[in-house]
């Protein structure tokens, strides 16, 4: 594995580079072009990736703890299982990325574009997730303050079937608490059939 800790790779062309398991801790990759690069299991702890192009890059299981990814272009990137604790991603484009099972504790995610992001089982304790843009570029901007509800809100806004289901549940849902005699239960069952 390559030891590039502290290396100055600013503006470097690393497209499709295979640097998996490499030590890039503290490295400067500001404005680097790393589209489709393979960073699996790499150590990028406290690395500077400000405004880096990382489209389709694979950071699966990588250590990005404390990394600076402000303004980074991560569209379609794979961050599954990555350690992003304390990372700064203000203004990053995470559209169509996969952050499933990533550790984002204490991560700053303000102003990120998250359209189409896969975010199942993400650890978000104390993460700052405000002004997340859930719409794709070219559509009116809609912002939410929670990654876990971003996709749901987008579907509510753009999918008539989902809206119809929610409306039906709200219109027909009735909560009845208590104990009922057999005669009253018959009446309740009749009401249920009508609804």
What are the residue ranges of the model-derived segments?
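Conserved N-terminal substructure of TIR/SEFIR domains
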Residues: 148-195
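Tandem repeat scaffolds
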Residues: 1-150
């Amino acid at each position: 594995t390559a030891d590039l800790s502290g290396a100055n790779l600013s503006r470097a062309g690393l497209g499709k580079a295979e640097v998996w398991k490499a030590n890039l801790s503290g490295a400067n990759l500001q404005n680097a072009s790393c589209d489709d690069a393979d960073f699996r299991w790499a150590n990028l702890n406290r690395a500077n990736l400000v405004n880096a192009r990382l489209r389709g890059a694979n950071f699966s299981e990588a250590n990005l703890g404390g990394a600076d990814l402000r303004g980074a272009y991560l569209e379609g990137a794979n961050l599954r299982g990555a350690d992003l604790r304390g990372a700064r991603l203000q203004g990053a484009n995470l559209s169509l990325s996969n952050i499933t099972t990533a550790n984002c504790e204490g991560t700053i995610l303000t102003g990120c574009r998250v359209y189409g992001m896969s975010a199942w089982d993400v650890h978000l304790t104390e993460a700052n997730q405000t002004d997340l843009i859930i719409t794709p570029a070219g559509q009116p901007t809609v912002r939410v303050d929670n990654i876990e509800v971003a996709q749901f809100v987008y579907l509510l806004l753009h999918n008539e079937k989902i809206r119809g289901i929610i409306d039906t549940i709200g219109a027909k849902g009735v909560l009845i608490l208590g104990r009922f005699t057999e005669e009253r239960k018959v009446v309740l069952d009749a009401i249920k059939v009508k609804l």
